[in-house]
Regions:
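Active-site-proximal binding-pocket segments
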Residues: 75-78, 83, 91-279, 404
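Trp/Phe/Arg-rich N-terminal binding region typifying the photolyase-homology
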Residues: 1-98, 102-108, 112-126, 159-163, ...
Length: 445
């Protein structure tokens, strides 16, 4: 079995984030753009040098703190790449640019295996029941999620996660490794705990990041958290505390092969049915008035169609987990982000101002609003694999029953990058210069 540790991982991070969250972040697009501009001077060589350092809660100064905005596309990948290349050459900003594409890789990889995430969700209750039925395993699980293990540093990460909605990238990897190989808990439950508490929690990067640490994404290649690599990246956070005081002396010294609980079918590639590029002028069925509404979800809060819609409405936040609600921090951030997106629809259109729903609505209220507004068609950004996608697809039939069609449109960036994410990151990563060229971003500062 091949084990990796920090020394082997200086060139990438398992979650493909590197652009991280913090509780001080305000869930508006304006604040995301301000943070993007503020971090740009540090997105070149300085980022490459210092991005691996975890200084502790409130001290994550060497990362951009953009991931919540990217997660919900309050800002999008293309404008982040364009901005960084206005300040740095592609070579100087390579590590920052690569992190953006790591996140895109995870999203695209899961798109090619559309059965994996739904099966993982179906297995979660079974996995939890099995843990709860074992006295030792249940005690270990309950202590882990309560931050009451005999590893004080692990407990500190739990506290930071629950209090801020954030963990540094390497802390996420160390946490996952300890959860799996030291506490011997199922990766599935660890991934679920993360996605409920991380403000930037994402079905693709979170689920697949945990599988990567467990040695299931790249078969047999596990990630081992060791006292040495933790101290290498978190020296200032740990201070003069000894390994014994931190519980680092209790860490597993080797990994082991985990059983693959997802079926072979779930792990196989599935046919892709991405929307065809949208026509320049919207079409409308005979007899219809052509009243089109833009539908927003938490997956993409900035996408707009070429033509001004007659109205705009947002779908209420989707539950991230089948086991428990998301944390209060996550819920408040997503609610406020949706409200900000609706408010922004009052501005920025070339001609008329659309009628905007006062708040995000559940399925029943959303359909009622569309009917009241006399809408014939709903247009929405393509939804990647995850809970929002299931809900949007579930709207097709009840919308059709009211004479309202549903059209999805895909971003050019996703259409460019995702087809190359079906295998390992290397196959996508080597095309980054090509992607930048296609996007007319190859010749930055």
């Amino acid at each position: 079995m091949q084990q990796t540790s920090f020394e082997d991982q200086s060139n990438h991070t398992a979650w493909g984030l590197g652009l991280e969250a913090d509780s001080v972040l305000e869930p508006t697009r304006d604040k995301g753009l301000q943070r993007l501009q503020a971090f740009m001077p540090n997105a070149g060589r300085a980022y490459q040098t210092h991005r691996n350092s975890d200084f502790g809660a409130g001290k994550h100064t060497h990362v951009s703190m953009l991931s919540p905005y990217l997660r919900h596309r309050m800002i999008d990948e293309a404008e982040v790449l364009e901005t960084v290349l206005q300040h740095h050459s592609p070579n100087d900003a390579f590590k920052f640019i690569q992190e953006v594409f790591w996140r895109s890789y995870w999203k695209g990889w899961l798109e090619h295996r559309s059965l994996l995430w739904p099966e993982y969700q179906r297995q979660l209750p079974i996995c939890l029941q099995q843990v709860q039925e074992g006295k030792h395993s249940n005690n270990s699980y309950q202590r882990a999620v309560a931050g009451q293990t005999d590893i004080p540093l692990f407990n500190d990460w739990c506290a930071e996660l629950e209090q801020t909605g954030y963990l540094h990238n390497h802390a996420r990897m160390w946490f996952a490794s300890i959860w799996i190989f030291t506490l011997r808990l199922p990766w599935e439950l660890g991934a679920d705990y993360f996605v409920r508490h991380l403000i930037d929690g994402d079905p693709a990067s979170n689920t697949l990041g945990w599988r990567w640490v467990a040695g299931l994404h790249t078969a047999g290649k596990t990630y081992l958290a060791t006292p040495k690599n933790i101290r290498t990246c978190a020296e200032l956070r740990l201070g003069a505390s000894t390994d014994q005081q931190l519980g680092l002396n209790r860490l597993a010294t080797s990994t082991f092969n985990l059983p693959e609980r997802l079926s072979e079918q779930a792990r196989q590639k599935t046919p892709i049915a991405w929307p065809t590029p949208a026509p320049g002028v919207p079409s409308c069925a005979p007899g219809k008035r052509g009243r089109r509404a833009l539908l927003l979800t938490e997956e993409d809060l900035t996408w707009r169609p070429a033509q001004t819609p007659a109205g705009c409405v947002a779908l209420s936040p989707s539950p991230r987990s089948v086991l428990a609600p998301s944390s209060t921090l996550v819920g408040e951030f997503v609610d406020a982000a949706l409200s900000d997106a609706l408010q922004r629809q009052q501005h920025g259109w070339n001609d008329t101002v659309p009628t905007v729903a006062p708040k995000a609505l559940d399925e029943t209220a959303l359909i009622d609003w569309l009917v009241e507004q006399g809408m014939d068609e709903v247009i929405c950004a393509y939804q990647p694999i995850g809970p929002a996608r299931l809900r949007i697809e579930g709207l097709r039939e009840p919308l059709a029953a009211k004479g309202i069609s549903l059209q999805l449109q895909m971003r050019d960036y996703d259409r460019l990058v995702w087809p190359h994410a079906s295998k390992g990151f290397f196959q996508l990563g080597k095309r980054i210069p090509e992607f930048l060229d296609v996007m007319s971003l190859a010749h930055g500062a």
